[in-house]
Structure formats: structure tokens, C-alpha cells
Amino acid sequence: MSPQAIEVRGARVHNLKDIDIDIPLGKLVGIAGVSGSGKSSLALGVLYAEGSRRYLEALSTYTRRRLTQAEHAQVDEVLHVPAALALHQRPSVPGVRSTFGTMTELNNSLRLLFSRCAHHVCPHCGARVEPSLNVAAGLSLTCPVCGREFYAPGAEDLAFNSGGACPTCGGTGVMREVDEASLVPDESKTINEGAVLPWGTLMWDLMKQVAGEMGVRTDVPFNQLMPQERDIVFHGPAVKKHILYVPKNGEGATPLDFTYYNAVYTVENALAKVKDDKGLKRVARFLREGPCRDCGGTRLSEAARQPQVRGINLAQAAAMTLGDAVEWVHGVPASLPPEMRPMAADICDSFLSAARRLVDLGLDYLSLDRAGATLSTGERQRVQLARVVRNRSTGVLYVLDEPSIGLHPANVDGLVGVMRDLVDDGNTVVVVDHDTRVLAEADYLVEMGPVAGAGGGNVIAAGTVDEVEQSQGSRIAPFLRADPKRMRPQVTDEEMFDQGHIRMATDAIHTVKPLEVDIPRGRLVAVTGVSGSGKTTLVLETLIPALKAQAAGERVPSHVRWVDAEGIARANLIDATPIGANVRSTVATYADIHDELRRAFARTPEAKAAGYKAGAFSYNTGALRCPTCDGTGSISLDVQFLPDVEIICPACRGSRYADTASHIHREGKDGSKLTLPQLMDMSVDEALDATVGLKKVQARLLTLHDLGLGYLTLGEPTPALSGGEAQRLKLASEMGRVQDDAVFVFDEPTIGLHPLDVQVLLNVFDGLVAKGATVIVIEHDLDLIRNADYVIDMGPGGGDAGGQVVCAGTPADIAACSKSITGRYL
């Protein structure tokens, strides 16, 4: 009899408590639990780690050397685990040459279509040649006008990453040009006062004197210069001028011959010398990116834009949204001569089968030429998922980490359909998620908990969804079976705008139509809508830049007609990007707790006797850091023929400190004595009890506790935090301040949050609102939307079918709006 389940015995990865669990094979298995309860540790740290490692071990040593390999999971035994693939919560951001079409491989089918089935252009006389099977057969075409023969371009000749690239932009579709408006942002200043910014930041300051020798008055406001003087500043010739250079200390003048660099050339010269991101950042403020003037942003050469199918070229086809492209491709075979239709149908079927799942996952609003780097995390994850389904593999374990991220409730059925397809093909799907609509579709449900961190790591419920719903110990059960309720009191229509308005009017940008919005100040405002409806464009690309510009007295973005937000001095985006670049950044250092602890330990008698000051207690640079791992807590071993092995430092056992640090104790109010390494190994909640008497530390720890982060250890590296944890940690410094001049914007703050964690998040928002802040969230989570004071629903659809404010008002108003797709689910 074949195995029926993956048998996990004695799993101890991260906070897992030596657990035993059987995961049914060939089923859709959901894993639930509060944040930090051990869900990902079980799914990714045990199931995926062991499934992928064992598959790779079956390969040759030569092959394994070229692959990234995982270390053995901390588990006694895992039996019957299939080869595993993981779809992570944060797929990598693709490079500048990647588009939605290349990521999904839809461009491959399109290029083949335009190579084999197009009306090609004769390179000799420019006449169009009817579609012919000669192209597929590798034969030449004969021009009906001039009679000369030529070969049609192959699929590779139509690729913007290969032979079809525009020679001007190299296939990127964009050109960087100097933005003259940014060179002199304040024309009320004189040149001597620094009106021409590049001369003070990218070029020697004495260029002001050279400009004076060029005939430009440098002691009058820039806006009073004559047109010819302005032209010299921006475009003057590179000629040598004799100047007297006086150093800042005023001692002695030195005669110099100096070549004049006009303001535009100063930037162009600096750009040409850029060697890294830091250098580009200095120059970027003076640049604007625009479409390539030769290819118009299509990335394709003129020759690659010549072939036509159904009256359009490849660039025009790629500019379509996926939904429009599907409709267009359906009509291609019928537009061709009868003998070509079978071949065209095969190519079109390949395109349509790949597109079907992308449409099911709600990505039909994306254009094929959309730059891959501009896709959201959820969009990239769904592209990844659709690609996996198309492979039609069998006998594989797929581990999906929160695939519902960024997914509107209207698209959940499509996601479940994709996962069911994988199971129907004979695979096992393990999905870590918090969305109760996704979990309710599982054949088998495992719940981890009961709480986060050290208090979690246990299986508190397992079985079918019905069995988990009846389980007394389950924390997800009430949300699987209960009707949703509103937690926060509803603000009445009469009170909604009591604290003021934020008003804004915009012109069209991307798919967002010209619109006006009115946002109540001092309220929790949710911006909703299906994927691609314009939420991100409205809030992140329009509202935040406009508020920041107005607060700084600068020009608002060109597509913003006007903004009225009197009294708003700060616009803060709290996003889910990881905090810190390496393991040296920890929860304690980011929250300014570690500095206070170092000072406290430096005041102890033992530290004073040894001559240790606060700096000695730094694990990054201090004298007490571990010399073996240099304060990182881990070391990397280079093992030949095997991957580098990252292990806990054997000298400090992960504490980051040398043994000397364990001899310096601080006495608590209860008489207990603790070392700094011991404190750093504690959770926030444990440290609250251990640091009584340290007022600043207590206040900061209490803030983290109130943010729902009490389970995090002080020494936990910040890059390892989930998106939701990172967002809340970034808020730590803002809590407790008066915020009536502030707007806080959260981009999908419920990412990675259990329904119970969403309640904690709502309490955090209440704390900000109580201090006068205006809190704006871009969100799909129905529990959060239901608890907002005010909702702005974008749509009605995605892409060209969206970009409008469908309705705005209380959640009840949205639910009653017949045009709102979000309202149907509320």
C-alpha cells in the first residue's frame, strides 16, 4: 500500500516544540495560526526544507555545487516527503528587462505568432507580403512587388532582450534625461546663493565664478536674469575662462583657467561617471525618466515593429491588457489563409492556456508590456503560481506562503481553483494563510499555537475544517464559523468631517481617470477595490507625494491639479519592506532599546571596575563583542562540494558577546541578576519584567507590546521579520506623540496577520487616531475594511475598467452600493 501521509516526528525548527504531525498526501492542506506561532517553521522550515534537500541530494555532486542547498532541518524524522517547491511570500523583484509578458512567458507565444503568421515587410521596397507557411518551413519569401527574395525575422529577432532590441535604449524602453526644472528649484535665489543646485553638489562651487566670466549676473535673483543669461546657465558652451579663486579661509587669491560646465552638462557628466547606486542617487534628483524617443517605450527596434497580425504590430499587441489580448488572440486563426490556421491555432492555444490561469487569478488588467519591477508583491506571487500550474507536474509537494496577499475577495475563487488544479494533477499542496475563505477550502487543516514566539510551536488543532471548527482549543474556529462583527464604534455621517478635510483633484495618470477625493481628517480611512483599480496610484503615487510637496512648500506632482490639506506637516508611508540589510540590525537596536541597555550595564559596579563604558557593550564595534563571529552570532563554513553551512557561533552560542560579557550583571528590582546577553535572548514581554527601573527601556518595550510584538526576542534580526511585523516595528517611534498634523499610510498592513492579530492592529490604529492622526490603509481584508470609519472604493474593475471612485462613505454605504464589487463581499 502506498504512503498516505508525510510523517513528521520530533520537529524542533525555530519555536516548534518537538512536534509530531501527519500531513495527508495528495490533498490541499491549510496551516493556520497567529503570527509567530510556527506555521512557516513547519511548512517551510520542515516540509519544504526536507523535500527540496532530499531531491537535491539525489543529483550529482557536480550539479549540486551549482545549486543553493538547504541545511538539514532540526527534526528526528520526516518520512514519505515528495520533492518540494516553495512559492515564497516575497518573490524577488525582477530586473529592468523583465515585463509581465516575459515573466509569464506569454511573449514567447506572441513572438512566435508574429514570426510565423504575420504580414512581413519586404526590406527592399517596403511592400507587405501575405502570411505564408514558408516562414515555418525556413524558406524565403518573395516580394509580390519587386520580386526579390528575403527571409522573415525569427522569433528571436522579435525579442527586445535579443535581436529585436531598440538600438537607442538597448531594449529597456526608457531614456534618462536632465530635468531642467530641478536644476534651479528656487528662482528667488541668486547664483551666488546657490540657485543652480548641481554647481554646489555635483561640481566645484567655483563654477559660479566661471558663469560670471561668461557674462551671467550672479548677484541678482535667478528669475530676473535675461533669457540669454539663462541660456548660458543651462546650455552655454564649454569654453575656458580665467578666474581668481579665493579659498573659504580668504587667504590669498589663486589665478585659474577653468572650463565652463553648464548646468545640464554638469549633470550629464556626473551621470556618465556613476559607478554604483550611491552615485546614481546623487544624480537622480536632477533626472527624469521618459520613454525612448526612437521606440516610444516599446523596447523594440523599427524592424521588429514591422510584422503585422490582424492589422497591428507586436508592440501594439504587447500594449494590450491581458484581457484584451486574450480576446484578440481568439480571432487570429480565422484572419489567416486556411492552410495556416492549424499552425496558428496551436500557437494561440499555447498563449490562451497560459493566460487562462492568470485571468482566473485576477491579473487580466495588466498589460503585457508592464515593467516587471512595478508589479506588487501579490501580483508577482500570482504570476509565479500560474507558471507552476502550467507545468502540469505530478507527485510534487507545493508549499505556498500566503498566496492570498494582495488578492481581492472577488479573486479568491480563482486562487482556490489553481490550488485544486495542482491537487488534481496528483500533487500535495500545503498553504500557509490567514484568509478564512482560503482555509475553509482545505481538505485538512493544521493549526499552530496557541500564541506567538516561545508560547507557540504546538499543534493545537488538526483535522478537516469541520473538525477544527468543533475543536475547543482552536483559535481560528470562531472566525471559520462565526458571522463577522464590527469592533470599533461607527462614526456618524454628521461627525465624519468634524476634524477637517484633505481634498485633492488629479488629472489622468496610468489607468486612473481625472477625479476628486475628499478624505476626513483624524479618521481611519480604507482605500479599497479590485487589483488594478487604481488604489496604489491614487494613494502612493499621488496623495503622498502631493502632501509631502505641499508640506515642504514645493511643487506638487504634475498630474495633481490641486491639493487642500492645511495643517498637514507629515505624510508617512509605513510599508512592509524588510528593516535593515543584515543580521546586525535587531529588534533592540531598531527600537532604540539596546543603547539604553548598554548605558545601564556601563553603570554597574562590575563594568566600572573593569573600565567598560557604554561603547564596550556594542556587539557591532565594542570590546565585549564575540571575536569569533565578530558580533553576528553565526559563522559560515566553506565545505567543499557542499553548500556553505551557516551555523550558530560555537564560541558565543549565538549571543554575539564574548564570555567576558557574562561576568557583568545588572541587578533587577526583584534582586535577580542578569547579563546583557541574557536580556537580548528574552522576548519583549519577558524583558518588561526584567528591566523594571529603566524607565526609557520600559516605555519602549511597552510600546512594542501594545503593537502586538511582545513575542519578538530583543536580539532577533530585523531582516527576518515578516512584512506585518516590520510595519508595526516601524511605528514604534511614532506611538505616544501628538499626531494631528500627520497622515499615516499603510499598504496592506494585514499581510501575514491572523484575524486575532487584525484586532491588535485595529487597536494600534485607534491609538494613532486618538492622537489626532489620519490613518489611510490600502486594503483587501474585509475585517479591517468593515471596521474603518470611511471607505473610498476604487474601480469598478481593474486596468482600463477601473480608475474611478465608485463610491465613498461608511462601510455600510459601500455594502449598499450596487456598483461596488467590494460592497458585495461586505
Named regions from a protein language model:
Residues 1-826:
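Conserved phosphate-binding elements of NTP-dependent enzyme cores
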